[in-house]
Amino acid sequence: MSTGWIVIGVIVILVLFAFGAYNRLVALGQRVSQAFADIDVQLKQRHDLIPNLVETVKGYASHERGTLDDVIKARNSAMSAQGPAQVGAAENQLSGALGRLIALSEAYPDLKANANFQQLAGELSDLENKIAASRRFFNNAVQEYNTGIQQMPAALFAGMFGFTRKDFFDLGASRTEVETVPNVKF
C-alpha cells in the first residue's frame, strides 16, 4: 500500500510541475507577444509620419521622384509585413529609403531650413530611438522564452504543449548599425 502512495505522490508532483512549467512558458510567450505589439505601435507611428515627410520633401525636391517613390513603396511593404522576420526585412528596406530621403536635405538648403521638415525629421529620430529600445526589449523577451523552452526539465513538457522557438527581430544590419541611432542634423 505504501508503494502505491509513493507512485501517486510522484505522479502528483510531476503533474504539478507540468502545470507550473506550462504557466511559466505561457507567461514568457505573452511577454514576447506584448513586446512585439510594442514594436508594432512604434512602427505604425513611423508609418503615419512618412506621408507628411514625403509631402514636405516633395514641395522642395519634386524632381527626386525615384527616392520619394522608393519611400512610399517601402512603407507600403512594411505596413503589410507579418511576423518578426518579415517585418524586420521590410523595415530594413524602409530605413534605407528614409535615410536616402533625409540625405536629400543636404542638397536642398531650403528644405533643410524648413520648420516642418525639421519637426518631422526630429519626430522620426525620436521614433527610431523608441523602435531601437522596443526591439531590444523584444529580443530580450525572445531570448528568455527560447531559453525557457530549452531548459530541463521544462523542455520535456514544452514540445508536448506546443511551445516552439521564436524568431528575433532582426533588421538585417550589423550590431553596430542597429544600435547606432540615425543622427539628423540641420
Predicted regions and their residues:
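A helix-centric hydrophobic-segment signal that preferentially recognizes long
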Residues: 2-186
